[in-house]
Swiss-Prot record:
Active-site residues, Swiss-Prot/TrEMBL: E420
Annotated cofactor note: Binds 1 zinc ion per subunit.
GO terms under biological process: protein catabolic process; proteolysis
Binding-site residues, ATP: G197, P198, P199, G200, T201, G202, K203, T204
Gene: ftsH
Quaternary state and interactors: Homohexamer.
Its membrane topology: Multi-pass membrane protein
Record topology, Periplasmic segments: 34-104
Keyword Metal-binding: yes
GO MF, one example: ATP hydrolysis activity
Keywords: ATP-binding, Cell inner membrane, Cell membrane, Hydrolase, Membrane, Metal-binding, Metalloprotease, Nucleotide-binding, Protease, Transmembrane, Transmembrane helix, Zinc
Places the protein is found: Cell inner membrane
Name recorded for this polypeptide: ATP-dependent zinc metalloprotease FtsH
Family annotation (InterPro entries): AAA+_ATPase, AAA_lid_3, ATPase_AAA_core, ATPase_AAA_CS, FtsH, P-loop_NTPase, Pept_M41_FtsH_extracell, Peptidase_M41
């Protein structure tokens, strides 16, 4: 503040001085007024003619005004008869003193003004260079942002669904509140705590809640903030960060995405002389050099613990590793209750139903779901958020936005309907498959149609039967195309299904030991640089086993569809008519039961006979039209 006042005073003085000088010059020389310069002889002629009204004589300078209003000035010479001439012609004249103090001071300032201006410019540039030098020296300063205990409003009440992690960190909160309680008994609080978990599970929020509960300063920094283009900057920032922590102890330092700086040493293009490794070395030294009474605790977060350096994870640095996983149904319900407090909801909205229908959602996904539901309700001009808004938001997140502007031809709709019906029939006939939530032929995202399945319960592992069922369901679309239209009419719509099936089958063979010929061995990914090189024979064997799994799944899907061909036709016809069907409606169609379908106008009962087919083929007219359109397209 003092420096700011000094700068303001300096510039105000300069502005006032320049203003005074300009005003004095304007006063004496008539700046801004047009003055006409004339010769002294011409001036004498004008006096004799009586055209001069008044003049001012200052030394050898004469300025005045003619009777016509024109201003003039001239330089006088040694002319002793000037005063009598002026009196004779009744010219009003005034003699000014040229050697007064103000005039002398003004002349001095005028003569020194260019030099003073140069000195001022030089001082200005020197200050700018000095400020630039200070900015350059701040490269080594820490970029950690301080969140004081007053501004941090997040507490454990704002964190839900990760009760085990909160229990683990409660000890740290107690230490930050009462460090002497532990030190009296000789106990040492963990110097570092590493939060491990997928993105969106609340690692950063949990760290802020710890600082909010303990009422201590909270420093936040990203792992990428340490490394710059200059050598040694990262290590300097680490030192400065820990110095700030010691000054504000007890405090909490949170390093987000620590894998950016804590990656395993000796791996990468930099080798052992990498700037990142110097930063990591300094971080290791600073963490190991803490004393128990300093009250500075490091909490870091990462979703890639496998790439961290082992020295960073040893006891004495990050003593505790807390895994934060995707919340289960109970955790999702608690998270939704926290977010639903912020929006008005309809009385019939049940949090348990929403939580049951969002398996695999992280805390960030659930927050996004609630926000999307509120936006959808506002777009529909509602006063509260209803179940329909939550369901629409969930479908939008899981399946993508509806592409209503995409116009599909009838033959393309027919192909898509049978493709999705193939997925639906195979899924419904396999007990190990997840229940179907919804099937649609409305284009969503990059898909022309899809069958979305949702598990009834949270899973921590998968059985071989479940994986085989997923392979069969994935190949159900291609199998339906072959059964109904033949091999020549199969489409590229199964590209995503084939990719998904290939990835699953390869994982079964190379990761989970579900191939008798390959055996229970881990081979890893083909593009993994840490993976050992496979022999040609083993690589061919793996490819052969993967192909066999997918081929068997395609054969099994074809068998299921041939045995349930009437159900396949009914479901395809219903998809063409209604475009979207729920899981219960698909089950009713598979069993030939009537079901209620709510349309835009009313509730229409679709009977079994209205969707039945006379034989095991599609309507002849429809097929003939489709084949004609496809043949025309091939010719074009």
């Amino acid at each position: 503040m003092k420096k700011l006042l000094e700068n303001l005073s300096l510039w105000m003085g300069i502005i006032i001085l320049v203003t005074l000088l300009f005003g004095q010059v304007a006063l004496n020389f008539g700046f801004g007024i047009r003055n006409e310069k004339i010769q002294f002889s011409e001036f004498l002629d004008l006096v004799e003619k009586g055209e001069v009204q008044k003049i001012v004589i200052e030394g050898y300078d004469i300025s005045g005004v003619l009777k016509s209003g024109t201003r003039f000035y001239t330089k006088a010479t040694q002319y002793t008869e000037l005063i009598p001439l002026l009196r004779k012609n009744n010219v009003d004249f005034q003699v000014a003193s040229g050697d007064s103090f103000l005039g002398l001071l003004f002349n001095i300032l005028i003569s020194w003004f260019p030099m003073l201006l140069l000195i001022g410019v030089w001082i200005f540039f020197m200050k700018q260079m000095q400020a630039g030098g200070n900015k350059t020296m701040t490269f080594g300063k820490s970029k950690a942002r301080l969140l004081s205990d007053r501004s941090n409003k997040v507490t454990f009440h704002d964190v839900a669904g990760i009760d085990e992690a909160k229990e683990e960190l409660a000890e740290i909160v107690e230490f930050l509140r009462e460090p002497k309680k532990f030190q009296k008994l000789g106990g040492k609080i963990p110097k570092g705590c590493l939060l491990i978990g997928p993105p969106g599970t609340g690692k950063t929020l949990l760290a802020k809640a710890i600082a909010g509960e303990a009422k201590v300063p909270f420093f936040s920094i990203s792992g990428s903030d340490f490394v710059e283009m200059f050598v040694g900057v990262g290590a300097s920032r680490v030192r400065d960060m820990f110095e700030q922590g010691k000054k504000n102890a007890p405090c909490l330092i949170f390093i987000d995405e620590i894998d950016a700086v804590g990656r395993h040493r000796g791996v990468g293009f930099g080798g052992g002389n990498d700037e990142r490794e110097q930063t990591l070395n300094q971080l290791l030294v600073e963490m190991d050099g803490f004393e128990a009474n300093e009250g500075v605790i490091i909490i870091a977060a990462t979703n890639r613990p496998d790439v961290l350096d082992p020295a960073l994870l040893r006891p004495g640095r990050f003593d505790r590793q807390i895994t934060i996983s995707i919340p289960d149904i109970a955790g999702r319900q608690k998270i939704l209750e926290v977010h639903l407090k912020k929006i008005p909801t309809a009385p019939n909205v049940e949090v348990s139903i929403i939580a049951r229908g969002t398996p695999g959602f992280s805390g960030a996904d659930l927050a996004n779901l609630v926000n999307e539901s509120a936006l959808i309700a506002a777009r529909r001009n509602k006063k509260v958020v209803t179940n329909e808004d939550f369901e629409y938001a969930r479908d939008k997140i899981l399946m993508g936005m509806e592409r209503k502007s995409l116009v599909m031809r009838e033959e393309e709709k027919l192909l898509t309907a049978y493709h999705e019906a193939g997925h639906a029939v195979t899924s419904l006939k396999l007990e190990a498959s997840d229940p179907i939530h919804k099937a649609t032929i409305i284009p969503r995202g990059r898909a022309l149609g899809l069958v979305m399945r949702l598990p009834e319960h949270d899973r921590v592992s998968f059985t071989r039967a479940k994986m085989h069922a997923d392979l069969i369901v994935a190949m159900g679309g291609r199998a339906a195309e072959q059964v109904i239209f033949g091999d020549d009419k199969t489409t590229s719509g199964a590209a995503s299904d084939i990719k998904q099936a290939t990835h699953l089958a390869r994982s079964m063979v190379t990761k989970w030991g579900m191939s008798e010929k390959v055996g229970p061995l881990l081979y890893g990914e083909q593009n993994d640089p840490n993976n050992h090189i496979l022999s040609i024979e083993m690589s061919n064997l793996i490819d052969s086993e993967v192909k066999q799994l997918i081929t068997d799944a395609l054969k099994e899907a074809t068998k299921i569809l041939n045995e349930n061909i009437e159900s396949l036709h009914r479901i395809a016809k219903a998809l063409l008519e209604y475009e979207t069907l729920t899981g219960q409606e698909l089950s009713d169609l598979l069993e030939g039961k009537p079901f209620l379908k709510k349309t835009a106008d009313d509730k229409k009962v679709v009977s079994k006979s209205s969707l039945d087919v006379e034989d095991d083929t599609v309507d002849k007219e429809t097929l003939e039209k489709l084949e004609s359109d496809l043949d025309t397209g091939d010719k074009e």
